[in-house]
Amino acid sequence: MSSTQDSKAQTLNSNPEILLRKRRNADRTRIERQELAKKKREEQIKKKRSNKNKFVRAESIVAKTLATSREKERIKRVSILEDKKAKNETQHIASGKDFILKITEKANGAEENSVDLEETEEEEDDGLIREKTTYDGKPALLFIVRVRGPLAVNIPNKAFKILSLLRLVETNTGVFVKLTKNVYPLLKVIAPYVVIGKPSLSSIRSLIQKRGRIIYKGENEAEPHEIVLNDNNIVEEQLGDHGIICVEDIIHEIATMGESFSVCNFFLQPFKLNREVSGFGSLNRLRKIKQREAESRTRQFSNAATAPVIEVDIDSLLAKLN
């Protein structure tokens, strides 16, 4: 009788095979990730050593130094101007207002409408419509895409800190940002390194559904890892305290800039976008040249402290990158 009771206790205390298999898989994946991280660190060390021994021409050093000094001077001008605005010392400033310059391409075959000349400037040569407006300080939803900055420029420390704060460390990544009076000066500092625009609801939904990723730690997992956001149960588990139970609630909260906008925004990882043109073939090289020409028309750099923030048609850009 006692032997049968002992056998029952042993069967009850034994772990199911599924749990044991999950633990083995979790241990194996953890070891594989540690090995991959170790290999990545070793490759980075080798790359740093090879870059140290790399020959650098004197002309490239001079060009990089001059470009970086110009960029530092631009950021210094912007910082001084914003400091004067904060202290209300706008007597000797050309304009104490904040401006946004919206640049869009003309629609083919579109009829020219009568537009106020003070607010809109049109140039028939390049086929672009430029509309300069005054920012009134009202909150607005922006989508910011990190792009390559000016040629041969080492990003100054202040601009890099702002990019890190916005989680835009890598190129071809994007985040949602709520534009306010406090955010506007930061956008002026990082203007050469980003593309800014106001997304539509369809673009917001497409981004979150196709490229939404989060950091999640499941059961029997040693470390959190990045997963695709395609499970409403995970959303309810992580954001249920804020009244958000599905992906559609996240889309609505971001589109309307609700009370839980920052919670939803930081719950999502920065969106990793595709390159507009990739590859090294002859046709791809031609497309890259055309892309640079188009960017030179829309992305107009200015070293002036009072330069407006440039806004582009972000929906058309996301249609190419998403």
Swiss-Prot record:
One of its GO terms (molecular function) is mRNA binding. It is found in: Nucleus, Nucleolus. Residues 26-45 have a biased composition (Basic and acidic residues). Gene3D superfamilies: Ribosomal protein L30, ferredoxin-like fold domain (3.30.1390.20). The keyword Kinase does not apply. Residues 1-52 are annotated as: Disordered. Signal peptide: none annotated. One of its GO terms (biological process) is ribosomal large subunit biogenesis. One of its GO terms (cellular component) is cytosolic large ribosomal subunit. It comes from the Eukaryota. The modification Phosphothreonine is found at T120. Keywords: Acetylation, Nucleus, Phosphoprotein, Ribosome biogenesis, RNA-binding. Residues 1-16 have a biased composition (Polar residues). Its main location: nucleus. The modification Phosphoserine is found at S14, S278. The modification N-acetylserine is found at S2. InterPro entries: Ribo_uL30_ferredoxin-like_sf, Ribosomal_uL30, Ribosomal_uL30_CS, Ribosomal_uL30_euk_arc, Ribosomal_uL30_ferredoxin-like. Involved in the biogenesis of the 60S ribosomal subunit. May act as a specificity factor that binds precursor rRNAs and tethers the enzymes that carry out the early 5' to 3' exonucleolytic reactions that generate the mature rRNAs. Belongs to the universal ribosomal protein uL30 family. Present with 7720 molecules/cell in log phase SD medium. This is Ribosome biogenesis protein RLP7. The lineage of its organism: Eukaryota, Fungi, Dikarya, Ascomycota, Saccharomycotina.
